[in-house]
Amino acid sequence: MIEGKPLISRVTTIKGCVKEPANLRLRMGTIVADAIGECGGYTDEAGKIVMGGCMTGLCAPNDQVVVMKGTNGILVFNEKDARSYEESPCIRCGRCVEACPIGLNPYLMKHLCDKGDLKGAEANNVMECIVCGSCSYVCPAKRWLTASFKNTKDAIMREARRAKK
């Protein structure tokens, strides 16, 4: 609530493969396809739509999802730019550690997450990860660090909720 009024809209940046990139005030619940239509439509066939920004955003399954409170950006990628890379084994370069703004050890956390070791990941502070994407961005092996941490954090939270019941 701002000034006693509920949040029903927000300014959202729409960029990428759209004809007229813009900052639009969108109401909560606006369909992404309609927002892109306000920008003149697609310039190319959309290969991927990212909701929330390039570092911490999440891929939308299609353009029929809706704008929510956290939707500060919509990025549209064409097929060529949307291709995902094969993850390579960690080369232990340490760039992820240097990039982490809160001093975590992403390479170790990723190893534990990949093994499904929730307790080990939690003991190595995966819950402290702010999911900023810096580690994934600098990784020369194209490791999907951030996604792995987010999924592991979600799994730990699910386990905690289950344990409370």
Language-model regions, residue ranges each:
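Redox cofactor-anchoring modules in respiratory/redox and cofactor-processing assemblies
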Residues: 1-141, 147-154, 162-165
